[in-house]
Amino acid sequence: MAEKIAVIGAGSWGTTLADLLAKKGHEVTLWAYEPELVLEMRDTRENSLFLPGIKLNEGLAFTNDLAQAYRGCSMVLCVVPSQLVRRVMTNSLPFLPREAVIVSASKGIEVDTLATVSEIYQEILPPEQYRNLAALSGPSFAREVALEMPTAVTAAASTEAVARRVQEAFTTSYFRVYRNSDVVGVELGGAIKNVIAIAAGISDGLGFGSNTRAALITRGLAEMTRLGVAMGAQPSTFAGLAGMGDLVLTCTGDLSRNRSVGIQIGQGRTLSEILGEMRMVAEGVKTTESAYNLAKKLGVEMPIIEQMYQMLYQSKPAREAVLELMTRNLKAEGV
């Protein structure tokens, strides 16, 4: 079934998914905050700011008017940075069709409230509309999807009907969507992996090897799972695409913004220098702060997250943080 879809957020991932959906035959309008970006995409069929070199489907429409984006839509895909979800979706409420399925592809935890993205939606949306919420997450670099490289992700929703509808809307010959009912687990996997990816990048920047990276990924997965279980997620979710899959990709891939931030920190640059030069958002920086505070609030042990917080926000030297992780009290592996 062809959908009329509003895609909110024209970063690399939002633009890529809008293009994918348009190529599949859906009627798609991509909303961008910047009027000049809308004009460029209309004129050149390219998003040179966030997805350079990719020609966008001729059927894709562009706007910076929220009312126009939402008009008559049957599905909404929100792909704005997690710290902006509350503002953008609150502004969207007057225009949001009540029956529309809402797909969240934002990955993070709100700093001020420690709310996951679905919890933000729960606060904003009427109950009957919140039931139509799904989360889309998994190992998926935007550029690789834009180039139609085979990719698999997960769509999680509290109802089977919503999950199936999202699965059917997004699945193509190169983009395979699996269903899941664990919205909390899928969201947390997508959020926490960004913090671990910065840690893996720092390790690479310091010149440590594959052993160190493997340890960070594995113990990072344990921390992610502990936090998820404390919040009601299913442990098995973290062994899937939205957990281990996304974690491995983001900790090892050269297209990972979060890993790139970590590499530069490991090489001696300051966080403020790095962020000052970035056009796109590295979600893991803010998520480090929110995950650290959330773990403290829930009493969940997350030593990698704790050391990451001290490095990014308290100027702790990276080598000192690694030493502390390696000299903690000995324990059984477990989770």
Curated annotation (Swiss-Prot):
The keyword Lipid metabolism applies. One of its GO terms (cellular component) is cytosol. PROSITE patterns: NAD_G3PDH (PS00957). It is found in: Cytoplasm. Pathway: Membrane lipid metabolism; glycerophospholipid metabolism. Gene3D superfamilies: N-(1-d-carboxylethyl)-l-norvaline Dehydrogenase, domain 2, NAD(P)-binding Rossmann-like Domain. Keywords: Cytoplasm, Lipid biosynthesis, Lipid metabolism, NAD, NADP, Nucleotide-binding, Oxidoreductase, Phospholipid biosynthesis, Phospholipid metabolism. Catalyzes the reduction of the glycolytic intermediate dihydroxyacetone phosphate (DHAP) to sn-glycerol 3-phosphate (G3P), the key precursor for phospholipid synthesis. Belongs to the NAD-dependent glycerol-3-phosphate dehydrogenase family. This is Glycerol-3-phosphate dehydrogenase [NAD(P)+]. It comes from Geobacter sp. (strain M21). The gene is gpsA.
